[in-house]
Design a protein with these regions (language model features):
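Short non-domain terminal segments
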Residues: 4, 12, 37-40, 137, ...
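Short, flexible coil/linker elements and helix-boundary hinge sites characteristic
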Residues: 18-20, 38, 249
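Bacterial N-terminal signal peptides
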Residues: 23-38
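Pepsin/retropepsin-fold aspartyl endopeptidases
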Residues: 42-332
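N-terminal secretory signal peptides that target proteins for export/translocation
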Residues: 1-22
Length: 332
């Protein structure tokens, strides 16, 4: 039986930060026909200077920047930095120029780099950071991939790199997209029973599968056609491949929005109205979604064919909680 009262520790993680203002909700309904409505202007937590206390976990606040980026303020080798929380990436990745300002670069022992790794067909150098902290959470020393990439915005909106699944999985992160909080487990003996109490809060639980490539996917269906979506907090908008929609006979219209992929290629994003998208057993409210010629690396994760990318706009609107301990996605 479900408890009559939600345990305080779990309630802190489930509790919403407030309703989306009606005007902004209307803008989101047409986000692709005109422009992307910034999540950063949606309702914020009541007291953002205070992080909630949950036994066995440390909470780190994030904020939303331009293009729906979930940004976590961190310290890299004691230097302030901003990292994109990205469940679509396996690694910690830093912009090469930004890394140099943090003292992260070639090995001082004569070797140029610690090693190299291939990401989406690119061979990239691996360096080492001595320390990484976020709020009161200390992640210690970590390998970091260096990549030349365009910097995003200025000031607080600037992103210096990516915080990927390497860290998020190691610390069994629970990401609440709506309340702008990421909980990291520090006591491995504790485990929250999110599934039981989430149902009483009218969340729908969808199992997350980790593919051989490391990607996180969830089941979906459109027009009765089943498939899998890549759960990607680094994607600013939920997007489907144009070939998939053409096969379903779904029409789409051009927009002024474009998306840039890690390889540096940019694709124009079209929009399509979808009224019957289901993620697991959760029926997504009718909305316009992105349609683009997605790169091959995004459409195939190991032996799994990907039907689309579940991006931050839908995750936020549907109050998403991504539980990397229980491996479940909660939506409502």
């Amino acid at each position: 039986m479900l408890p009559r009262k939600i345990p305080q520790s779990v309630n802190v993680i489930l509790k919403a930060a407030g309703r989306m203002p009606a005007g902004l909700a209307a803008r989101m309904a047409v986000l692709l026909s005109l422009a992307i409505a910034p999540i950063s202007s949606f309702g914020a937590a009541k007291n953002p200077s205070v992080s909630p206390q949950v036994a066995g976990y440390k909470a780190v606040r994030v904020h939303y920047g331009p293009m729906n980026k979930m940004i976590m303020p961190v310290q890299i080798n004691s230097h302030p930095a901003n990292l994109l929380v990205d469940t679509g990436s396996n690694e910690i990745i830093l912009d090469t120029d930004a890394a140099a300002t943090f003292g992260v670069g070639p090995s001082p022992r004569g070797l140029r780099y610690v090693g190299f790794t291939e990401i989406n067909g690119q061979l990239l150098p691996v360096a080492f950071m001595q320390s990484l902290t976020a709020g009161s959470m200390n992640f210690g020393s970590n390998p970091v991939v260096l990549r030349d990439s365009p910097r995003s915005g200025t000031g607080k909106a600037q992103v210096d790199g990516v915080l990927g699944l390497h860290i998020l999985f190691r610390h069994k992160a629970v990401i609440n997209c709506r309340t702008r909080l990421v909980f990291f487990k520090i006591d491995q003996s504790r485990r929250m029973n999110l599934s039981g109490v989430a149902s009483s809060e009218k969340f729908t639980m969808i199992p997350i599968h980790r593919e051989a490539s490391g990607a996180l996917t969830v089941p979906c269906s459109i027009h009765g056609q089943t498939g899998r979506l890549l759960v990607d907090t680094g994607a600013f908008v939920t997007t489907f491949p144009d070939t998939f929609f053409k096969s379903l006979g779904i029409s789409f219209e051009p927009t002024r929005v474009s998306a840039r992929f890690p390889t540096g290629t940019a694709q124009r994003v079209s929009a399509a109205q979808i009224n019957d998208l289901k993620i697991g057993d959760f029926k997504v409210p009718p909305a316009k979604f992105g349609v683009a010629a997605l790169p091959r690396f995004a459409l195939r994760q190991g032996g799994t064919k990907i039907s689309g990318i579940l991006g931050m706009d839908t995750l936020y609107i549907c109050h998403a909680i991504i539980d990397l301990d229980g491996m479940n996605l909660f939506l409502k």
